[in-house]
Structure formats: C-alpha cells, structure tokens
C-alpha cells in the first residue's frame, strides 16, 4: 500500500551470498550445514556431560552449560534461514520474522558478552580465593550471576528492535546480509535515524566495553595471583583452568569488535558478512571443541560417559 513516497513493506529479501556462483553457494551450504550440526551436537554434548557427570557439578561447568545453551540459541536463530537462502534460494523473510530474528540475535549477543564476564569472575574467585570458592560461588550465587548475565539481553533487544522497526521503510526491501542485522536493515529506513544511531553506538560500546573491562580486571588479578605461585606446576595448573576461557573470549570479542567498530570505509558488505560468520557460525562450533580439547576434566568426563553408554548397550540383549 503506497502512502506518499513510502511503501508498506510486508517482507524483506536477504541477499545472503547471492552474488556468488551457484556452485560456490552449494559448497557453502554443505560447509555451513556441517558446522551447524557439529555446533548443535558439540554444545548438546557439553550440556549432557556436565549434567550427567558428578565431577563436573562445579560453578565453572554450570556457567559453561549456560554458554552452550546460548550458543545453540545463537545458531538456531541465524543458521537455518541462511541455509535456506543457499539451498532453495528462499531469500524472503517476513517483516515479523526479520524483527524476531534481530531481537534474538541482540538478546543472545548481549547475554554472551555478560556471561563471558561472569565466567571470568568465576575463574578469578577460584584462583585468587580457592579456600572460600565453594562458599562464595554457592548454588544461589551462581544462579543469580547466571540470571544477571542473561537479563541485560531483554531490555537491549526490546528497545533496539522495537525502535528500529517502528521506522517507515521505503524503496528497496533487499537486506544485504545473510540475516537481519541492524546496520543493513537501517539502510532501508526512510526517516531521520540520527538519534537511533547514537543510541545504537552508545549501547553497543557499553554492552561490549563493560563486560570486556570486567574480564580484563579479573584476568589482571588472576595473572598477579599466578605469578605469586612458587612452583611451575602450580602456575601451569592455574593457567590451564583459564586458557580455554581466554581463547573463547578472544575469538568472540575480536570478531564482533571488527564487525561493529571497524571504520565503514574499510569494511565492505562482503567483508562484514565474513566477520559476522566468525562469531555467529564459527565461534559457537569452536567453543565446545576448545573446552573439551584443552580441559582434562571435560575429556575425562566424556571418556567416562562414553564407556558408560557402551556398557549399557552391551547389557541390552
């Protein structure tokens, strides 16, 4: 329905990787499908193992379980639709579908930032106050910290998504991305978005920088505590408990920061798609691999669980 020069848009078209040849898109489909399945299986396995094995009923693995839930949600929001655009060329997404995808993208993204900060604090308490660790990080405290990590996603996602989709859209309805991210959708708005853009920039900086500063503060104190440990074996053991989390934090923050804080003149739509893939598709797959390969407790728990499953199968006639 036309209103002046504005057109009421009922759906959007995700350009995804349509500029690439069909053969390349087919290859991308197989690649992303494999990554998607590995992500779901890997994170589901982390959840099941940390629940089933009594040795992993500590605060560290409680937060790791939360991270795995989050990564599964991230993948379910982004990847299925992207696979549809590559396989069946189903590039359309409804107005409500686009808003819903953007909402949950913001929700899971913000939650991950704060959850990574909470996990860093957990490591700080474990290394700097080992004797008081069970008391400080009791069941009630860890539940509160987890809730505090998930909660900020709700107001941020609600305000940003509701505000953006209250603007009128005109002209093209083509979103030059593989999902409904804020910057490419904002380009389709035919109204003054200066105030929204200021809010988005300030909000993004706060959401990224506050958890990042908390992580840096935690690891600065952790590093100081590790340096005071007299034995090399003790230092190695303390560092090994943090190395997996540090690697996960680095992957997430470097890729997301390059996407949203890199100068626009140096960041083409295609390069932004690649950067977005790193933290929406690749990082969720790598997290369970990093934690399982670099953590002996998780590896041992996986081995115990595997042997229990084999034993149960052998008992069944």
Swiss-Prot record:
GO terms for cellular component: membrane; plasma membrane. Its main location: membrane. Disulfide bonds join 98-190. Expressed in the tongue. Pfam families: 7tm_4. PANTHER family: OLFACTORY RECEPTOR. This is Olfactory receptor 10A5.
